[in-house]
Amino acid sequence: MSFNFRIGQGYDVHAFGPGDHLMLGGVRMAHSHGVLAHSDGDVVLHALCDAMLGGLALGDIGVHFPPSDARWKGADSAQFVQHCDQLLRDRGWRVGNADITVICERPKVGPHALAMRERIAGLLAIELDAVSVKATTSEKLGFTGRSEGIAAQAAVLLGKIAA
């Protein structure tokens, strides 16, 4: 049986470390900390990539961009999204919509949500209303609640491109 839709979900987390900004959803935002990561550590775009790859059973971000590969040191995660999008398109699929949740106490994501949505919609060449970015806290519980790091979840609906 063949379906014209698939769902993918992704999750990413990074610990806070030295620095004065974060990259979230392709948007640079001032923050009291950076993140410990091989690339730019954009948890939003990393979770999005994992969701896109997962929808077509293409592995995960670590398979395509291993931290052991020096090419990805400090890399802009937008490159990862573009690569994943091309993998989907090469197989006849596109992202129909993306729903992303950032989990953190700080920074406050709300003021940056529109810019993040615009950046992601642009990377995927989809409508702005097909990208949702929202945030929640963990009510001071766990590593995000103690402000030790940041996490993101993403869900995507993939659609088969009509021939």
From Swiss-Prot:
Cofactor, how bound (note): Binds 1 divalent metal cation per subunit.
Reaction equations catalysed: 4-CDP-2-C-methyl-D-erythritol 2-phosphate = 2-C-methyl-D-erythritol 2,4-cyclic diphosphate + CMP
Pfam family, one: YgbB
Keyword annotations: Isoprene biosynthesis, Lyase, Metal-binding
GO biological process terms on file: isopentenyl diphosphate biosynthetic process, methylerythritol 4-phosphate pathway; terpenoid biosynthetic process
EC number: 4.6.1.12
GO molecular function annotation: 2-C-methyl-D-erythritol 2,4-cyclodiphosphate synthase activity; metal ion binding
Annotated 4-CDP-2-C-methyl-D-erythritol 2-phosphate binding sites: 12-14, 38-39, 60-62, 136-139, 143, 146
Associated pathway: Isoprenoid biosynthesis; isopentenyl diphosphate biosynthesis via DXP pathway; isopentenyl diphosphate from 1-deoxy-D-xylulose 5-phosphate: step 4/6
Gene3D superfamilies the UniProt entry points to: 2-C-methyl-D-erythritol 2,4-cyclodiphosphate synthase
Positions of a divalent metal cation binding: 12, 14, 46
Subunit details: Homotrimer.
Family statement drawn from the similarity comment of this UniProt entry: Belongs to the IspF family.
Protein's UniProt name: 2-C-methyl-D-erythritol 2,4-cyclodiphosphate synthase
Source organism: Xanthomonas campestris pv. campestris (strain ATCC 33913 / DSM 3586 / NCPPB 528 / LMG 568 / P 25)
High-level lineage: Bacteria, Pseudomonadati, Pseudomonadota, Gammaproteobacteria, Lysobacterales
Designated gene of the protein: ispF
